């Protein structure tokens, strides 16, 4: 099952309910909302989309698994395309 984790070169600046990511290889910034920041914080080690979706549902009571899975897939794909996360096979 593919897993994803942070690119170790990316810097993260936490703010009140958000975070700003900086990818030094591309000089690109990315602003994360509270939900995306929660997921980013889970990526300190490799995790699967299903594991991230489960954690999201546990953290936010009103989130349903199907919606969480879609949202996680979308966020991970965007972060991967911008070089903020890396994938690995387990």
Task: Indicate where each model-derived feature is located.
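Long, charge-rich, low-complexity alpha-helical segments
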Residues: 25-90
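Long, low-complexity, charged/polar intrinsically disordered regions in eukaryotic proteins
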Residues: 1-27
């Amino acid at each position: 099952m593919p897993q994803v984790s942070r690119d170790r070169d990316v810097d993260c600046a936490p703010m009140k309910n958000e975070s700003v990511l900086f990818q030094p290889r591309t000089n690109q910034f990315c602003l994360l909302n509270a939900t995306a920041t929660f997921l980013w914080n889970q990526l300190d080690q490799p995790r699967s989309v299903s594991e991230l979706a489960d954690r999201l549902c546990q953290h936010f009571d009103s989130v349903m698994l199907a919606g969480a899975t879609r949202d996680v897939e979308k966020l991970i794909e965007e972060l991967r395309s911008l070089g903020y996360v890396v994938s690995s096979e387990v």
